[in-house]
Amino acid sequence: MVKRKYLILLLILLFAGAKAQVQVDVKLDSLQLFIGQQTGLTLSVTFDAEQKLQMPDIKKGQELVPNVEVVHVDKPDTAILNEGKRMTVSQAYTITAWDSAFYYLPPMQVMVDTSRYESNNLVLKV
């Protein structure tokens, strides 16, 4: 009987924790470029549909880090998941670099409701 209570409590905790998960991911189309060549960078956020998402305010012409510039910003793309319970919002950027080096691209930050989440970091070789 005691084992059954612990099992039920464990299942409740697992399902409660799974509901609040937010996943933030950033990917580069190419990790290596020539000077002036362009590549895509995509930021994707998966979260519960009833939550409010605020993406980073990155504009065309802005530098992510010195010498790595955003040359184009696409409109966000939204995918509905799990019969409307979750969603993924993806934002695509086109970037270029103006000098040869290894560039550390720091994590991108998003806000979901009142919590801040960060993506993975990347390294770009030019």
Locations of regions flagged by a protein language model:
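Bacterial Sec-dependent N-terminal signal peptides
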Residues: 1-27, 41-42
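Surface-exposed interaction/ligand-binding surfaces
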Residues: 20-126
